[in-house]
């Protein structure tokens, strides 16, 4: 008895001694567990400072790069159908429990452990699922780790219930859910899949979205339409089971198909979307590998950019203090760009006004009479089938389903079935809702004319405006930074620059006759004359030749200097694309990007200096510390005198030649120089023009070269591209961004004759514009 008492005393002694330490250890454990729990304010309003800001030259925010496309809504903005579907499916006792559903846990435990029925799920309430956002579960934590995680979720769920109403918890939950397709939160999901606000969702639409909550890929109606339909109908059944709708209504609604208006909303809206996309591409660029390039010139150009341009691949070149790479979507960077907000707005408006109000309507009228519209009448069936097949395989519909493992024949069969869809249109809404087959939608989109436009400031090289296409939401391809097209007569100023550099002058005279060459295969090649018959055989000046875009005069100059010298001059002035050194180069047989062409032309108003385009001046971290500052590289490409001679030559194009519409139709009075360009079959229309203050280039054409206007009356560069330039310049002048009083700076000692009056044949005021014979033919 005495020993038993002694043992009891000893036991309690050690309990009393160790209890404080055990309690302290437990408290320390709790502190460790919950020290990093975000506050409720952070849960309800996640910190947005970590979104990267892209800032215009005047301080305006163009956009933010962020990891989640999320817009928060209030409970009042939720459809009752959505509330009912969520509660019925995810947590039927949501209004009754206090964060943890004890009855639900017991039910799951009994059926899962005793009856081995794993279909009962994990018994998590909506509140617990919200708590999971605080503690994302990691793989490989083990059973003990999962116990701790579950404990955290339970405690946080109870804490949430004590501090928020049920309505607040429900809306926070719906704001936190990821629905796939870059849609975070219920508003983004509603807009992405149905183009509606959450308050507008019908029963079947709400059920579709709620069905995606736990497995957004498996039940995605775009990727897995059959599974999505089955899951949606399950949710509708749950709504009937929990008395939110009647059984009769449920059975009726289940018969309704899923009618999507699917449109991913990730960074599509806002100003300068093509520019922002180009910025992201360049900052994420990896070190160039030769195997990824067809031409050595392109590889060399990107390799030099990697070496000399810190912005190119910036995210792969720069590290945080801890050694990690910066993340464009969540590190709160501030990127200061050279884009001018008003110039950019004016550029996008100019594109919309010309293409939307005029050119596209004219093209649509032509297409009504084409058997194979939008393809030209001479396009054979094999070519048409190839272009359509390529388009199908590049479509989201095809790629998403192939990625999900759907057999190719099943996917292709869908392209002949009519479905509801939303397609781009030049109207106030920017789209139309219609019913057509996916094949017809491909033809619809191919019928839309594409464009590209970029404006670069002389001397600084700053990019001020950048439009990569007609509408970024529907046409992601960037025709400025990614595309290369045949350049037509816009190539001719490089040949004339070579002539001026070699000692010729604008008033030098030549006889206007066709020129023949021995082609590489030994045959004769004669560039087709684009001049009126009465002009042939006349003595003309070089200035007349460029003003009227005469192929005969360009061919004459090519004979004097050769294709190698011309290609070298183009590379010196900033063209880095591959150039075939052939005689046809003199009339535009080269594919070059718009940005290259504009940057090369920019050497002329920059007094002969080539300046690499610059579009970011500095990058700061989230605290305002400067991480990088950027300057461009400059080099003398041509002599200052040569540049001034070329300005004089190219002013003739605008004053009397194929660019004269800038004066007559748009009333522009300041000093302007430029060149139009049109390629074979009117596939490409160009205009690149510059003033003392800005150099701007515009290209317009079809997605494929086989899509074009029938004649030069509508398909010339002076009709397709030049009007965008004219509209944009008028808007910028009205905004006070430029002045018509600006003048090109002449060299200190001008000792050459620029007055060629009396040395040329007489032409109309608008010269070759009236003759409509600007088209460049490579072979006759």
Model-derived segments and spans:
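Short active-site loop at a secondary-structure junction
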Residues: 71-76, 335, 445-451, 474-494, ...
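Short, well-structured active-site flanking segments
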Residues: 95-105, 184-186, 246-251, 500-521, ...
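A penicillin-recognizing enzyme superfamily signal
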Residues: 273, 337, 341-357, 390-457, ...
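Extracytoplasmic/periplasmic proteins that interact with beta-lactams or build/remodel peptidoglycan
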Residues: 124-126, 143, 197, 205-208, ...
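Peptidoglycan glycan-strand catalytic modules in the bacterial/periplasmic cell-wall system
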Residues: 49-51, 55-306, 312-315, 321-324, ...
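Active-site-adjacent helix/loop patches that line small-molecule binding or acyl-intermediate pockets
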Residues: 125-126, 134-142, 146, 339, ...
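N-terminal type II signal-anchor transmembrane helix
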Residues: 1-55, 93, 113-116, 358
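Short, glycine/proline-biased beta-turn/loop segments that scaffold the active-site neighborhood
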Residues: 257, 482-539, 612-627
């Amino acid at each position: 008895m005495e020993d038993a008492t002694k043992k009891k005393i000893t036991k309690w002694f050690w309990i009393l001694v160790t209890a404080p330490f055990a309690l302290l250890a437990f408290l320390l454990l709790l502190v460790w567990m919950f020290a990093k729990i975000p506050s409720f304010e952070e849960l309800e309003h996640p910190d947005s400072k970590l979104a990267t800001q892209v800032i215009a030259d005047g301080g305006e925010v163009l956009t933010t790069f962020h990891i989640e496309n999320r817009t928060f809504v209030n409970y009042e903005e939720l459809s009752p159908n959505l509330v009912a579907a969520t509660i019925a499916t995810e947590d039927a006792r949501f209004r009754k429990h206090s964060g943890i559903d004890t009855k639900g846990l017991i039910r799951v435990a009994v059926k899962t452990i005793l009856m081995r029925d794993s279909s009962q799920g994990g018994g998590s309430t909506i509140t617990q699922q919200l708590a999971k956002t605080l503690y994302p579960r990691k793989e490989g934590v083990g059973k003990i780790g999962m116990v701790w995680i579950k404990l955290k979720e339970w405690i946080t769920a109870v804490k949430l219930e004590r501090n928020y109403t049920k309505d607040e918890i429900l809306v926070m939950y719906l704001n936190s859910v990821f629905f796939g397709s870059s849609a975070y939160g219920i508003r983004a999901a509603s807009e992405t899949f149905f183009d509606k606000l959450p308050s507008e969702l019908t029963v079947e639409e709400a059920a579709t979205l709620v069905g995606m909550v736990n497995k957004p890929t498996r039940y995605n109606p775009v990727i897995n339409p059959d599974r999505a339909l089955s899951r949606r109908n399950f949710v509708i059944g749950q709504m009937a089971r929990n008395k939110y709708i009647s059984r009769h209504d449920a059975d009726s609604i289940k018969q309704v198909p899923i009618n999507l208006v699917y449109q991913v909303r990730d960074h599509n809206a806002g100003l300068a979307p093509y520019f922002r996309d180009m910025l992201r591409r360049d900052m994420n660029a990896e070190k160039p590998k030769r195997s990824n390039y067809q031409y050595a010139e392109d590889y060399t150009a990107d390799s030099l950019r990697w070496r000399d341009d810190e912005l190119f691949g910036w995210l792969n070149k720069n590290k945080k203090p801890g050694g990690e790479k910066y993340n464009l979507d969540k590190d709160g960077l501030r990127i200061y760009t050279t884009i001018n907000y008003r110039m950019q707005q004016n550029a996008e408006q100019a594109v919309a006004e010309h293409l939307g109000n005029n050119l596209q309507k004219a093209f649509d009228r032509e297409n009504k009479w084409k058997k194979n519209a939008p393809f030209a009448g001479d396009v054979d069936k094999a070519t048409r089938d190839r272009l359509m097949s390529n388009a199908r395989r590049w479509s989201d519909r095809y790629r998403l389903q192939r990625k999900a493992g759907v057999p190719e024949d099943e996917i292709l069969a869908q392209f002949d079935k009519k479905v509801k869809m939303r397609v781009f249109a030049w109207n106030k809404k920017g789209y139309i809702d219609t019913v057509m087959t996916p094949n017809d939608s491909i033809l619809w989109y191919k019928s839309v004319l594409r464009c590209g436009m970029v404006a670069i400031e002389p001397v600084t090289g700053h990019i001020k405006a950048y439009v990569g296409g007609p509408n970024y939401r529907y046409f992601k391809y960037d025709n400025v930074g990614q595309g290369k097209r045949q350049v037509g007569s816009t190539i001719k100023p490089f040949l004339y620059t070579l002539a001026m550099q070699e000692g010729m002058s604008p008033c030098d005279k030549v006889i206007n006759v066709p020129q023949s060459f021995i082609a590489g295969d030994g045959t004769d090649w004669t560039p087709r004359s684009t001049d009126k018959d009465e002009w042939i055989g006349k003595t003309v000046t070089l200035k007349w030749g460029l003003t009227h875009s005469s192929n005969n005069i360009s061919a004459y100059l090519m004979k004097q200097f050769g294709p190698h010298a011309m290609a070298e001059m183009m590379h010196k002035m900033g063209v880095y694309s591959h150039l075939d050194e052939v005689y046809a180069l003199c009339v535009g047989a080269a594919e070059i990007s718009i940005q290259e062409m504009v940057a090369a032309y920019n050497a002329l108003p920059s007094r002969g200096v080539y300046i690499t385009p610059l579009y970011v001046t500095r990058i700061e971290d989230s605290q305002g510390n400067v991480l990088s500052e950027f300057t461009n590289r400059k080099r003398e490409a041509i002599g200052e005198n040569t540049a001034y001679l070329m300005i004089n030559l190219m002013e003739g194009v605008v004053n009397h030649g194929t660019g004269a519409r800038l004066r007559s139709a748009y009333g522009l009075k300041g000093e302007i120089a430029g060149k139009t360009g049109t390629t074979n079959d009117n596939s490409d229309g160009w205009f690149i023009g510059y003033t003392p203050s800005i150099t701007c280039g515009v290209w317009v054409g079809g997605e494929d070269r086989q899509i074009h206007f029938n004649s030069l009356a509508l398909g010339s560069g002076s009709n397709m591209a030049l009007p965008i330039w004219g509209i944009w310049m008028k808007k910028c002048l009205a905004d006070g961004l430029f002045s018509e009083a600006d003048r090109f700076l002449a060299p200190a000692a001008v000792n050459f004759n620029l007055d060629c009056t009396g040395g040329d044949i007489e032409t109309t005021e608008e010269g070759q514009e009236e003759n409509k014979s600007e088209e460049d033919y490579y072979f006759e």
